[in-house]
Design a protein with these regions (language model features):
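C-terminal helical "tail/cap" subdomain of flavin- and related membrane-associated enzymes
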Residues: 65-66, 76, 82-90, 296, ...
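A short beta-to-alpha transition loop/helix N-cap that caps and shapes the active-site region
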Residues: 35-39, 176, 190-191
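Conserved N-terminal helical subregion
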Residues: 1, 18, 47-186, 268-269, ...
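Short, solvent-exposed loop/turn segments at secondary-structure junctions
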Residues: 10-11, 22, 33-34, 52, ...
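Conserved FAD/dinucleotide-binding core of flavoprotein oxidoreductases
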Residues: 85-106, 182-302
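Short, flexible hinge/linker loops that cap or flank conserved catalytic cores
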Residues: 147, 249, 318-320
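Conserved N-terminal glycine-rich FAD pyrophosphate-binding loop of Rossmann-like flavoproteins
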Residues: 33-53
């Protein structure tokens, strides 16, 4: 059996590791020309679902490297006003378990971790154009005139998936009406003092009038500005980082990143055309009454890291007839960052698909029925996450409406302040948040064994 994976993102690369360990022939085709291409330097939160999936799919030492290269753990989940007054702060549970825990990692770091050990499997500079299906094989064609043939083609090519457009033209994505401006700045003596201690040690959401919001993450890593392991980092972590070849491709250093979001009609009409300094100026223009420290964060941002994001979401569709083409991650269930589970859902897909393909390898199932079982489960939890994420991030939310928006914001703030003074309610809220992020789910264990010898 040969598997063709279109797209070298989180889900596709994780799947490739699992298949490789299972002795299944797999190739990944990535359109970027180099492993360092693309703007991958922002945070991704890996929840217990994602951690279990990576633990199941990656070789043991590579998973340990993933844990060693994550950012410092967040201690708090904070909700604040635009003048940095606390509305709600949840103390997150500390966990020393390398699997059953939340992790923050730079997207570039995660990319380099997942590319480790896949030399000869990932082909760069491969822009997918189309596929052809036949009874016993499928062929992918690329813009450079080459092609590849296998038994199964997996679309892991993101929200703009060309595979999906050809295979499931009825599967659409739509705008949420929300646009974000993203940027990051290095942690310095000045920038570190601009945020309160809980913000520096946590994940923070700012709820402001007119539906404006801003997320702030502080990311500190185990290596310094020169890429050397920091003093005081010893033991296995130090050894793993020193041995990891991916660090030479990783430009990640300690940073603060932020994402300012609002309904599209609250931002300049040409927001998606702006870049760099123009986006920083826009962020400052639309936040005149915000705390000076937040505005200073915007001013200190590296213009080269700033870009606009038009938030899209999938429209759930009915099940389709399964075949030798399937999909995972954003290619089928693009979701807003409202719940922070997009990458984790892609990893969940990768484990479940890998499990089914191992069954095919072992003769327990035929290929198409195995794909069907994977898709039936994936559609259920994937589109559920899409809908719940969209509910958290849409211009249809009352907070974006004139008049009623003020009342909605006032009600939201009152509710958060009330909960903030009720420790049992805070614990329930924290536990509910963690349950949604997979804290109590056990389906993502997978014991990958090599193919039995004939």
């Amino acid at each position: 059996m040969r598997v063709l994976v279109i797209g070298g993102g989180t889900g596709g690369l994780a799947l490739a590791h699992g298949l490789r360990r299972a002795g299944i022939d797999v190739s990944v085709y990535e359109r970027d020309a180099l492993r360092t291409d693309g703007l991958h330097g922002y945070r991704v939160g890996i929840d217990p679902d994602g951690s279990r999936a990576l633990h199941a799919l990656l070789p043991t030492e590579l998973y340990d490297t993933f844990v060693a290269t994550k950012a410092r753990d967040s201690k708090y989940f904070n909700m604040l006003t635009e003048d940095l007054k606390e509305l709600l702060s949840l103390e997150l549970l500390e966990s020393t378990d390398p699997v059953e825990s939340e992790k923050s990692i730079s997207r570039m770091t995660l990319r380099q971790v997942l590319l480790t050990g896949l030399d000869g499997i990932v082909e760069f500079g491969k822009e997918f154009t189309r596929f052809e299906q036949h009874a016993d094989h499928v062929t992918a064609y690329f813009a450079d005139g080459t092609s590849a043939t296998g038994d199964l083609l997996v679309a892991a090519d993101g929200s703009g998936s060309r595979v999906r457009r050809q295979y499931l033209p009825q599967a659409k994505t739509e705008e949420t009406g929300i646009v974000a401006i993203a940027g990051k700045l290095p942690i310095t003596a000045e920038s570190a003092k601009l945020v309160p201690p809980k913000v520096f040690e946590g994940i923070s959401l700012i709820n402001a009038p007119r539906g404006f919001g801003c997320i702030v993450h502080v990311m500190e890593f185990q290596w310094d500005h020169d890429g050397n392991v920091k003093d005081g980092i010893g033991g296995n972590t130090e050894e793993l980082i020193r041995r990891w070849p991916g660090l030479q491709f990783d430009n990640t250093r300690d940073y603060i990143n932020w994402g300012l979001s609002a309904a599209k009609d609250k931002l300049p009409a040409n927001i998606m055309e702006l870049r760099g300094a123009d986006l920083i100026k826009t962020a400052l223009d639309v936040t005149p009454g915000w705390h000076p420290n937040l505005r200073r964060l915007f001013e200190l941002t590296d213009p080269g890291t700033c870009f606009p994001v038009n938030i899209w979401t999938s429209v759930p569709i009915d099940p389709w007839e399964s075949s030798n083409v399937t999909l995972l991650g954003d290619a089928i269930h693009t979701m807003t960052p409202g719940r922070g589970v997009g990458a984790n859902t892609a990893l969940r897909d990768a484990v479940n698909l890998c499990r089914k393909l191992i069954d095919v390898r072992d003769g327990k199932q035929e290929l198409v029925p195995a794909v069907h079982e994977y898709e039936a489960r994936m559609i259920e939890y994937g589109f559920d996450a899409v809908l719940k994420s969209r509910a958290q991030m849409t211009s249809a939310d009352p907070v974006h409406k004139p008049g009623i928006g003020r009342l909605a914001l006032a009600g939201l703030r009152t509710a958060m302040r009330t909960v903030n003074h009720l420790p049992p309610a805070k614990r329930r809220m924290r536990d509910q948040m963690m349950t949604f992020r997979g804290a109590d789910r056990d389906e993502l264990t997978l014991d990958i064994t090599p193919a039995p010898q004939p």
